[in-house]
């Protein structure tokens, strides 16, 4: 049984719209957290395993690099650009799923860095999902982690590597 590959332009639209939905979900959940939760106050959802705790993270995962917000902003911008290039070149829907998750999470984090306090390029990430006191994250983090895991698993079990088109220009030999 063969699966029909989507047209490249349809796949690109799907990846882009999926990424934008992830951004909307992440930013909407952050709006909810900021309008509902008190800073650093814990609200259990599942005992002490999972809860809500609003914090503003100037760094990366686990608060690392908190003094290097501009560098993290540049890394996020480069990641978004690279993921857009990959999204435009991918031809496999299975690969596109992972790219969409990474792109949505990266765009949302870049938006936080650029638009949130304390200022442009130095914005703090809004985190509010507390995982048993080990770390606090957000919806974008969930998509970033699950998409990365998905792509690793896909690369291990997929028979053919993901196909990335260099460009859609005809080759020199066909002119």
What are these regions (language model features)?
Residues 1-175:
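Alpha-helical transmembrane bundles and membrane-interface segments of multipass inner-membrane proteins
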